[in-house]
């Protein structure tokens, strides 16, 4: 019901005559829910603004497959690169996928974990959110055969000819499956397996470079680049930083 001017004036006078404690009790009694809803809306707004202000833009997406790195090495591979490139660490990041495990050994005790890692890699590749992968030989072979990897010789020749002259002799060739009839064999539509492969220079062994000599890796670790990466300029500068 709408109050008259006289009633409004009476309420104002009564409110002014209250003690501070009575005023607080009156406000909480009649305006508790509007106040709570207003505070909730303000908290949501502040949270959104804070998230936008502190959100970091990924410069690169990097995965570690069958490879564990310590905190110091991880820092060198992420914030070290950003600092060397003159990028603001508060606004940029190298996003990492850690603890990925790939194997084609169906008898391994970690088969379910390997399957989950394979799905995670597939999702990241399909989303365009995986650029560089550090991996051991087994992971390198699997990624190469699946056709995930970019030819590094071509990448370097196109984007950094000077580094190409130095690094191309060090690149490792691996098989890439062009076609196979394993499904047809499984369905009894073909009698013999027929797999067609070609070789590509899609791996760079890292143990000989200063940054990795004291890394303590168990065996050789290879740098590989995902074929559908859209950040090839950043990938090239990253390789130049790692192998400098």
Q: What residue spans do the PLM features occupy?
A:
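A bilobed periplasmic-binding-protein/Venus flytrap-type ligand-binding module shared by bacterial periplasmic
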Residues: 211-231
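Extracytoplasmic "Venus flytrap"/periplasmic binding protein-like
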Residues: 110, 116-190
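Extracytoplasmic/periplasmic/luminal assembly and interaction segments
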Residues: 78-132, 137
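Short amphipathic alpha-helical coupling segments at ligand-binding clamshell hinges
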Residues: 230-241
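Short extracytoplasmic/periplasmic juxtamembrane "stem" segments immediately C-terminal to an N-terminal membrane anchor
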Residues: 62-82
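Hydrophobic membrane-insertion alpha-helices, especially the h-region
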Residues: 30-52
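Short, membrane-interfacial amphipathic segments enriched in basic
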Residues: 9-22
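Short, well-ordered beta-strand elements
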Residues: 58-68, 93-97
